[in-house]
């Protein structure tokens, strides 16, 4: 296998002309900066939860997964990547990050509280932080090779990737979000928002990268949800909140991650996996599989 690319969290290896091995590390990033410390088992959680959601949503939109079973991985792949690796189809990435928002939070809340809009789109007056939106909305950002992604309007996104591709990614993102939000709610979890990525192969648009993980989504425990603040979460908002207290300017290098934040993040990720899949994380593939 030949190393192809290293991202903030994942490493890609070329297996053949049309197959890649995608390996999720335990690295974690906030504000587009990779932190100096890792979260144990994080890569396995991301892969396990992605595998679950890719399987559950395949009837809604096709995806790039070939297999996450260690027995299907290339013989040159070592046992240490079991549970954190997927064999996937090679695609040409669409240069957008596609976001479905069901609740008013994060950067969407920041813009709304100042301007009454989200990505330039007017929303009803009087909404509060973390409030459920009248209906889920689609927003997008550019996919930057380095540095910060930039929010774009629907018109700018369509100009960037073409009208047809834009309409497809918008439809797929909202379709998947609505399905996943309903499933999560039945498990006592609110899916506040999520980010999806897409790629094209043989003129077919596929969902790629990860799906509905605590890295790419905001998950809130329904029993503790309240409008007007920052709900407890099963995602990396816990890490973001810590770094927001430090006065850090969000440029590398980032300060070290305290052990309490490392342990708390791992616990939240594992809990998200178990609540959503209904399975013990101990059952997911690991180095001893």
How would you name each of these model-derived features?
Residues 1-143, 250-256, 260-289:
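Active-site loop/lid in soluble adenylation, ligation, and acyl-transfer enzymes
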Residues 211-272, 276:
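C-terminal helix-cap and adjacent tail motif
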Residues 132-163:
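A short mid-domain helix/strand-loop element embedded in enzyme catalytic domains
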Residues 25, 47, 81, 179, ...:
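Catalytic cores of nucleic-acid ligases and guanylyltransferases
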Residues 44, 48, 164, 168-171, ...:
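Generic recognition of stable, solvent-exposed alpha-helical segments in well-folded globular domains
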């Amino acid at each position: 296998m030949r190393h192809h690319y290293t991202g903030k969290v994942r490493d890609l290896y070329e297996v053949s002309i049309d197959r890649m091995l995608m390996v999720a590390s335990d690295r974690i990033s906030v504000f587009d900066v990779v932190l100096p410390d890792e979260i144990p088992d994080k890569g396995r959680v991301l892969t396990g939860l992605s595998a679950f959601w890719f399987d559950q949503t395949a009837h809604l939109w096709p995806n790039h997964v070939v297999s996450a079973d260690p027995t299907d991985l290339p013989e040159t792949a070592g046992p240490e990547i079991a549970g954190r690796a997927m064999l996937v189809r090679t695609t040409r990435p669409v240069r957008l990050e596609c976001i479905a928002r069901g609740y008013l939070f994060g950067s969407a809340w920041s813009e709304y509280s100042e301007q009454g809009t989200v990505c330039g789109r007017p929303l009803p007056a009087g909404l509060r932080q973390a409030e459920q939106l009248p209906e889920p909305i689609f927003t997008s950002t550019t996919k930057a090779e380095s540095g910060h992604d930039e929010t774009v309007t629907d018109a700018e996104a369509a100009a960037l990737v073409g009208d047809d591709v834009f309409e497809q990614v918008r439809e797929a993102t909202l379709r998947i979000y609505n399905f996943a939000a309903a499933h999560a709610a039945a498990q006592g979890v609110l899916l506040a928002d999520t980010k999806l990525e897409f790629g094209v192969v043989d003129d077919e648009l596929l969902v790629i990268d990860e799906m509905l993980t605590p890295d790419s989504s905001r998950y809130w425990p329904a029993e503790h949800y309240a409008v007007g603040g920052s709900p407890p979460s099963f995602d990396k908002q816990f890490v973001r909140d810590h770094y927001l207290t430090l006065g850090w300017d969000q440029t590398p290098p980032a300060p070290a991650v305290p052990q309490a934040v490392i342990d708390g993040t791992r616990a939240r990720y594992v809990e998200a996996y178990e609540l959503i899949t209904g399975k013990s994380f101990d059952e997911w593939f690991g180095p001893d599989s």
